[in-house]
Amino acid sequence: MKIKLLCTVLLAMSFANTFAQSSKSTWGKTDYEDAPWVKNVSRPNEITEGLQNRHLSVWSSHGRYYDAKKGGWRWQRPILFGTTEDLYTQTIVLPYLIPMLENAGAIVFTPRERDWQKNEIIVDNDSRTNYKEESMKKKWATTSDKGFAQHYGSYNDGENPFTAGTARQVKARKRNSKISSVVYQPTFLETGRYAVYVSYQTQKKSVEAAEYIVFHKGQETHFRVNQRMGGGTWVYLGTFEFDKGNSINNSVVLTNHSSHRGIVTTDAVRFGGGMGNIVRGGTVSGLPRFLEGARYSAQWAGAPWNVVSKSNGSNDYNDDINCRSLMTNWLAGGSCYLPEKKDGKKVPIELTLAIHSDAGVKTDDSYVGTLGICTTQDGNKTLGDGLSRKVSKTFAEQLVANVKKDLDNAFHINWTTRSVWDRNYSETRLPEVPSAILETLSHQNFPDIKLGQDPNFKFTFARSVYKTVLKYEANMHGKTYTVQPLAPNNFKIEYVSANKVRLQWRPTTDASEPTATPTSYNVYVAMGTRGFDNGMNVRNPYFDIELLPGIVYNFKVTACNRGGESFPTEVLSALRNEGATQTILIVNAFSRLSSPAVVNTSTEQGFDLEADPGLSYGPVAGWAGRQANFNKAMMGKEGPSALGYGGEELVGKVIAGNDFNYVKDHAEALRHAGKYNIVSSNSKAVEYGEVDLSKYAMVDLLLGNEKDDGHSLYYYKTFKPALRQQLTKYLNNRGKLFVSGSYLASDMQGVDEQDWLKNNLKITFDGANYDNYNSVVSGMGMSFDVYRTINEQHYGAYTPDYILPVDNAFSTLTYADGKTAAVAYKGTDNSVFTLSFPFECIKDAPTRNSIMKGIVNFLMKK
């Protein structure tokens, strides 16, 4: 008996040692080195030490789902402080994290709809509407397998659109002549940004470099798609600006030109995220698809029923959690990372990450903070290709530690972390590749969400996560990494000859990342009404370009290195007018990003969206509605009596934020104002003395909604001392200044600041205009509307200033209540026109042109 027991123990020890030796802590020699699923071949910068050829699955938590027990569509988490987790985490993942990963070269799959576009247009070979084939040397034919087909109206649960139609195929051709092609030319109901998804079939002889060309607002971007993987679902190419209507300049073309022999296949092409169309309980959600859970997107993407609904239709809540990982496994099956799963799509996804927020409160105004979650004790003993599950714990630990380090370094806040839980969670148990859940913060604790709704917090948080993914992947493959740079600063444009301008900027240092140094820059150009091109990579921090006359040129710049590309600068503009002898300078001083107005007293907490909804980085779909309950005594409760409870009137609205492209609105209006050249600059370049204002016949200072609000993580002041100094010097030299902004007087409450307004702008502060629902402004021979409220088209002039003229200045525009909205001054010393709302908030372009012409004539004519 003792001998038998000893043998059993020895056998167990031998098995344990064998298992320990066979399970890996890195991918080792396992590495995908063939053509990526999708490659943008128009990218001007080369990435060699980033996330190139890495395929990742990343998602934001929850989403609207159908509750079969209670009978109705509902959120998975409660509405608190104007949002819900179902909405909030998307505002980190979609505008920040995924773009950072893609800028590093990664191919990112996300199981929830990623496009904040409510319209959807599908062009398909089965309907033939807006679909056109051209067969040259090689002829298009129908494949033997089922493909996508769309029918009118909604879809029943379990109905797979990718088995309802057909697909097409053609032999590939190496020669770049007599090329066969398909044109997908949709009719867009609205101008806007649309995600482009293609679909095709993977066959035995499929090519690994199918050529797709996206035509967008007169530009074209080329892609290579590896059709040896990922057939029979939607494949994301990118998001592009398209014009309203039907035009070849806004289309997708697939050709059979390829460097490889084989077959090119094609099916439907989808433009835009669209509205939810899956019926549950007899009804659709009634919301955009991007607000729904992943379960419904998975069905629309052709996933098998056992992936879409593990519960077989009985529990959508569980299905939504499970299908994210199951869809990742389905796509990755058969790749080098999941070689044993033969029935998959062979997409080499090697990492999953779920971004959540959490509940919990602190009564002492401290942070609940960040938590990591992994699963090492449940599920399969090893991950794909024999990888130890413990690698997921390493990933989760690094995510949490780096978030604290980066947030503390950036904002000096002593951010709280809550270690890492190693527990049985579906999103970390089911994936067959390394995985983690990151609970960003507590959406129930106001100190957390107060920071969490600041766009600069979101950027820094997302950048920390991106950097952790980058470093983790480099370690897993034994590679060198380089962190992508930060966006350039002090961007300016100046004339260097009669028809040539120079764009110039400074690199931004990232003190926490020594590798994040730019080695080159991408310069993007848009002429007139055309969209931005694909960029030109330059080595130096400047770029000269000759301008054609009469066309407004728009520019933006990114910083690059071996690790990838930064976010862009703001858009600056320039115009050359034949025969012009004077130049007008537009100065962009509107860089504010902020949460809504903060209420934080001994008895009340929350966001006051009515006073100021804040400014997101571009549009955002993260708000549910205005907060109704501010009572701190109800902290930690749920339902209508809870602190933070509010409405749902903003659900489904993609609310406009700071797009950083308002200089072009001013430039376009100035183009109609007379025969002047136009250049522009960021205000920091002016503050640093890098721009000589005395060279310009007129300065147009764009302040937008800039102000020091007292709660933002960064300091946004309308007239900083350095800017005031430069403007005073300019005005003392008979300068001509046009300045517009919502808070240009209320943000100047110090005695010296008020004196500066009186002496230089000839105005005083006369209170705030709280009547945001009366948008009419009158004067200068017209009445017109101004954006004043939360909307989807343009940020609003929320509670703008009333101003009064002093000395010989006079009122020129009034709000609906008769109080002054604009003051003009013309003296022997200088001329000033002050507008107490942002010029770009005038809704109608012809009205902007007329108002600008009147202002320029007043300032420039003697």
Language-model features and meaning:
Residues 544-565:
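Beta-strand-rich modules
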Residues 705-817, 846-853:
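A glycine-rich, often tryptophan-bearing local segment used as a flexible ligand/cofactor-contacting loop or short
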Residues 291-389, 421-444:
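Active-site microenvironments of hydrolase-like enzyme catalytic domains
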Residues 472-515, 549, 563-582:
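Pro/Thr/Ser/Gly-rich low-complexity, intrinsically disordered linker/stalk tracts
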Residues 81, 98-104, 112, 281, ...:
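Aromatic-Pro/Gly-enriched surface loop or interdomain linker
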Residues 180-204:
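A short beta-strand element within beta-rich, extracytoplasmic domains
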Residues 217-246:
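Extracellular carbohydrate recognition and processing domains
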Residues 251, 257, 268-276, 351, ...:
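Active-site-adjacent mobile loop/cap segments within catalytic or ligand-binding domains
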